[in-house]
Amino acid sequence: IFLLPFVQSSMGKTDFIREVLAKNDGFAAEGSGTTGGAAAVEGNVFRVTNRQEFIAALGNRKNTEPRILMIYGTIDFDTDADGKRLTKEDYMAEGYDFQQYLESHAPHSTAPQSRKEEQEEKIKQSQKNQEKNIMVHVPANTSIIGIEHAKLKGVDLVLDADNVIIRNVMFESPYDYFPSWDPNDGPDGSWNSQYDSVTIRGGTHIWIDHCHFEDGTQPTETYFHREYEHRDGLVDIVNQADNITMSYNIFERHNKAILIGNSDAKTADDGKLNVTLHHNYF
C-alpha cells in the first residue's frame, strides 16, 4: 500500500522520477513549492546501487544543479570504498576500551578522573569515525527515488538545503556502535546514541513520501540498569527547518520516530518548523 511498485503504476518510470509535489499539498507546497530534481538533464539522472555511487551522484553539497538518484536494491552505508562491511572494530579509535568506559562511568566509580576523560575522548573519536562514513549531506534540488527494492541501510541523510524530494525508499536506521552514558538524562541516567535516518537540519521545501522507516535487528543489552540504546531517531526536523510535507510513510518498530524542534530555548525556530504530516502510519 505504501511503497509504489512501478509495474502497477499508471505512469511510467520517467514520469514518476520527475513528479513534483502538488499544489496545496502541505507546507512544502508553500512559496516556490517542492520540485526536487525534476528539472535534471539526462546527465544528472543516476542509477545508484552502492554507497560509492550514491555519494558520487550527489556530488558537492554546494552544487545546486538539479539531480535525480534512482535507487536499486539495498545500499549499506557501513561499508568502505570497496564494499567491505565495516564493524565496530573498524571505527574504534586507538585506545578505546569499553570495559574501561563502563568502569569509569559507573555510579560511585572509584576510577581515576583521567581514565574517564580519556575514554570520553576515545568514544567521541570513534563516533566521528563512524559519522564520516554514514552521514551524507544532500544538496539542493535533489530527488532520491526508490525504483526496485530500494533500501538505504545505516545512513544519516542530512537535509540542510532547499528543495529535496525522497520517495519510495525503505530506511533501516543507523546503528551507533558507540552509545554514550549521560548520568543526568532522566532520574536514573540514560544511554544516548547519535544519527537518524533523515536529519532535516535547516532544510526547506522537503517532501518525504511513500517511505518506510524502521530499525534493524539488534541485541538487547543493559548497563547500569538502562537499555544500551544503539539507535536514535528516524526523522529529526530541527535548526529552523521549514516547509516540510511527510505523506504516506510507515514508521515501524521504533520508539522515537519523529522529532520536530529540539529545544524550547531556540528562539530562531520561532515561525519556522512548519510541518505537514498526512496519511502516515505509525
Task: For the regions a language model picked out, list residue spans one by one.
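Bacterial N-terminal signal peptides
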Residues: 1-5
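Boundary at the C-terminal end of the N-terminal hydrophobic targeting segment
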Residues: 9-14
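Acidic Gly/Asp/Thr-rich repetitive segments characteristic of extracellular carbohydrate-active
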Residues: 23-70
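Acidic glycine-/aspartate-rich tracts in secreted/extracellular proteins
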Residues: 52, 74-77
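Extracellular beta-strand-rich solenoid/capping regions of secreted or surface-exposed proteins
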Residues: 56-65, 78-143, 151-168, 173-204
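Active-site-proximal loop/turn and secondary-structure-junction residues that shape catalytic pockets
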Residues: 75, 257, 262-264
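Short consensus segments that form the blades of beta-propeller domains
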Residues: 133, 187-189, 224-227, 266-271
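Right-handed parallel beta-helix
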Residues: 140-141, 145-148, 162-175, 196, ...
